UniProtKB/Swiss-Prot annotation:
GO BP terms in the entry: translation
PROSITE patterns given in the database record: RIBOSOMAL_S18 (PS00057)
Name of protein: Small ribosomal subunit protein bS18
Stretches for region Disordered: 1-20
Gene: rpsR
Homology family: Belongs to the bacterial ribosomal protein bS18 family.
UniProt entry keywords in alphabetical sequence: Ribonucleoprotein, Ribosomal protein, RNA-binding, rRNA-binding
Function, as annotated: Binds as a heterodimer with protein bS6 to the central domain of the 16S rRNA, where it helps stabilize the platform of the 30S subunit.
């Protein structure tokens, strides 16, 4: 019979925490006129991508959502993409 203690075990895999792309010294400012930046945080269907996927902090996610909504209202970004 095989002893359980003799079976080699795997090393545990630790995922590194993603850091917020908007915090730091040379981080870009969130602005409703910066369409190229805002489009990175919108899905193909036109929805705002959640922060658990983009690793944006809670405070910056609120700013980002407000900027996206403002750009949509002004016609700079589409509400829905077909």
């Amino acid at each position: 019979m095989v002893d359980i203690n003799q079976i080699p075990t795997r090393r545990p895999f630790h995922r590194r925490r993603k850091t917020c792309p908007f915090s730091g010294a040379n981080a870009p400012k969130i602005d409703y006129k910066d369409i190229k930046l805002l489009q990175r945080y919108i899905s193909e269907r036109g929805k705002i991508v959640p922060s658990r996927i983009t690793a944006v902090s809670q405070k910056k996610q609120r700013e980002l959502a407000k900027a996206i909504k403002r750009a949509r209202f002004l016609g700079l970004l589409p509400y829905v993409v077909k």
